[in-house]
Amino acid sequence: MTATTNPNKALWEKGDFTEIAATMRESGEALVGKLGITEGMRVLDLGCGDGTTAVPEAQLGAEVLGVDIAANLVAAGNARAEELGLTNLRFEEGDATDLSLLDDESFDLVISIFGAMFAPNPFGVAKEMVRVTKPGCRIVMGNWIPNDPTLVAQILKISAAYSPPPPEGFISPVTWGVEENVVERFTAAGVAADRISFERDTYSFNSPGSPAELVADFRAYYGPTMNAFEAAAANGKEDDLQAELEKLFDEQNTTDDGTSIPATFLRVTVKK
């Protein structure tokens, strides 16, 4: 894939997102099971991390290419594929805004679950996803929803309150969680509005440890939270941020045995 100057590369190579992804495996497998993937399908998984959805796609027999901007996550994904004996799955470093090394109309399914939504230039991202999808085939996105009361939207909201203002021209990733924005971006890429559909869905974060231990994992391994703590520490508000997140995780935990926290997202299906 092509080299990138995308500033998100440093963000997602920070920490070790595989530690957070490990809490999302069950939901990733469940989501993939809803997508009608069959043996031999060509699947592009954008912003794939270490394979939370790419691995179950390959286990269903699809030929899967996982693309992620973070070199460490690509390496972790390829290690998982090798360990699992999945010769039909490979991971490559790349940028969702520039898939120029991939041929037009070459994939039966393009999927991006909490991945491409974080890329800058959302119109460019939509255009590239449409370009590489075969006619009559699908794009599926999972996008966090702005101001949603569940976990991830609240983590991002709380973290933003402790962080410096974003640079001029910054487009928030959660704008992908607004249906009107999604329609605007894909229609600009040539898709008819009536070919775009939406559904609210749920991803759960499951961990054997306590909610406070899961907060510690986010603080240690999740780039956006790590940045928020660095900014909070510079202003003497590190303990305040810690307390807010621990309260959030504790209130949203649904089990007495470890931690299980559901988070609502917008599932987008685009039929080319």
Identify the residue ranges that each predicted region occupies:
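A short acidic, Gly/Pro-enriched loop at the edge of an enzyme's catalytic core
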Residues: 97-109
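C-terminal helical/coil "lid" or tail adjacent to the Rossmann-like core of SAM-dependent
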Residues: 3, 9-13, 195-256
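A short SAM/SAH-binding and catalytic strip from SAM-dependent methyltransferases
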Residues: 108-123, 145
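Helix-to-beta-strand junctions that scaffold the AdoMet/dcAdoMet cofactor pocket
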Residues: 119-120, 133-135
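Conserved class I S-adenosyl-L-methionine
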Residues: 1-41, 52, 76, 83-84, ...
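Core SAM-dependent methyltransferase catalytic element
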Residues: 189-191, 264-272
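Conserved catalytic/acceptor-binding region of the Class I
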Residues: 123-124, 130, 138-209, 225
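Class I SAM-dependent methyltransferase SAM/SAH-binding core
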Residues: 42-99, 124
